[in-house]
Amino acid sequence: MAMLPKFFLVLLCLGLCSCSQKTTTIEGEQMTIFYRIVLGTSLSAKEKASLSQQIDRCFHKIDSIYNNWNPYSELSIINRAPADVPITLSVELSEFLDQVDTLYKLSEGRFDPTVGPLKTLWLLHLKSQTLPPKDVWEQHYKDMGWQHLEFQSNTKTLIKKNPHVQIDLCGVVKGYAVDCLNEICNTFCPNNYVEWGGEIKTSGHHPSGRPWRIFSEAAGTILDIDDMAIATSGNHIQKWCVEGKIYTHILDTRTGKPLELSSYPIQSVSVVHPSCAYADAIATVLMTFDSKIEAKQWAEEHHILTYINDGASS
């Protein structure tokens, strides 16, 4: 679950608040990714210890179920399973894959959580300033695809129709974790802010009484984010020049190749939505459109609030 660079500046300004504005801040690192939680109240030592324990349990659940980098996670066990054998899923993973299936269908396959091995292959070569052999990446491309999985939400089972297909939920699980953490925080204080790896969700308002404010580079301005989540995808940092072309870390599932800047002009996308998991996935989906106009039209058709920066058009 490697951290992707995000383009947010959170304007909490807590250090400038008056002494009457009590807050509780908990921050740390989980799975190599920094997290920060701010509550608009001063918790007692007992309450803070309880909150910290629940936060740890949330991250443990994420690691033990959804983390494909953990060889003992439920997801890793599924990835090692043979084809054509029904796999019984936990309630948590089954419900999550139901959301994933919805996102896959909504995006018409642009969001596909089986792209992981192909992406790893491309990044390994791009970081070495080379391109993978065509026959190698094309074989990886044939092995990926949500269509190679038979998921039954009613029976909570999954069957791999292709033994090589792998599930990688990195493109959505950070947002899901933020949703879970936000639910926990709401039981302690209705005004809170949660961030993990650049994915953000807020409830209520800032301790000063104003809205929570976040600067989004995709929007080019400060946004008021109350009782909503915001996620951003962008190509500013993770890109490589190979054989005269600039490639990014995002793959187009329609071609099996990473986005090449001359063909994909969108630089960053922010999505605002009640679900951080949803915003997380859709932000990446919108990066794969051929133009800002097309991406904006698709988002509007699906009633999704987005901010898209292509460095040119308004």
Curated annotation (Swiss-Prot):
A lipid is attached at C19 (N-palmitoyl cysteine). The keyword Magnesium applies. It catalyses: L-threonyl-[protein] + FAD = FMN-L-threonyl-[protein] + AMP + H(+). Keywords: Cell inner membrane, Cell membrane, FAD, Flavoprotein, Lipoprotein, Magnesium, Membrane, Metal-binding, Palmitate, Signal, Transferase. Residues 1-18 form the signal peptide. It is a lipid-anchor. This is FAD:protein FMN transferase. It comes from Chlamydia pneumoniae (Chlamydophila pneumoniae).
